[in-house]
Amino acid sequence: PCMTVGNIRDPKVAEDILARGDADFIGMGRGLIADPEWVNKVEFGNECDIRKCISCNIGCAGHRIGLNQPIRCTVNPAVNTGEDYMKQKVNKPCNVVVIGGGTAGLEAACTAAEVGCTTFLIEKKAELGGLASVISRIPDKKRLADFPNYMIHRARKLHNLFIFTNTGATAELVKSLNPDIIVNATGSVPTLPPITGLHDLVDKDGTNVATVLKMIERLNEYPKD
């Protein structure tokens, strides 16, 4: 028998390998760290619920092999505990307001909703996903989109998670939601080096000085080659 491995993330790719007779078995390591239920989800036709590995190698190879520390996972914060947290339902009404619809905000909102909290997610932009969705526009980083896409899909399925997009988290709005807990997940901004005058030029119209985020917004303006 022949087994093949190597970041086989898509169930269709795995099935095609087996159907062609290129291998008898598919071996999977990082994919099962990201989602231990990968195989079960494929078997029962729930591929859209798979939390795919993004091949960052930070928590698995980086921690376990490089640093001899316990395995962690960028996309699966429950890698060492499983979904036991879902059994710990809140025993009284609890309103949670999460500000920021990036991957951290989505994870916080989904987790709160899954344990029974009435949860409100507020995102100032039109789309959820935050920096992960932005960075995934870089050609060599496209697979990063799998993570925010999975998180958005997970969030949309929760009946007690209410999502506001194109909405600023004003004090009035947050107060009107009667929060018991407020989570600040507004993300980060690129670090700039201490160069005199840089702040006056960066990301300004008419200059060629840009942060990586502004550069990504202008990808279509650059030559394809």
Which residues are covered by each model-predicted region?
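Glycine-/small-residue-rich beta->alpha transition segments that form the dinucleotide
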Residues: 179-181, 185-193
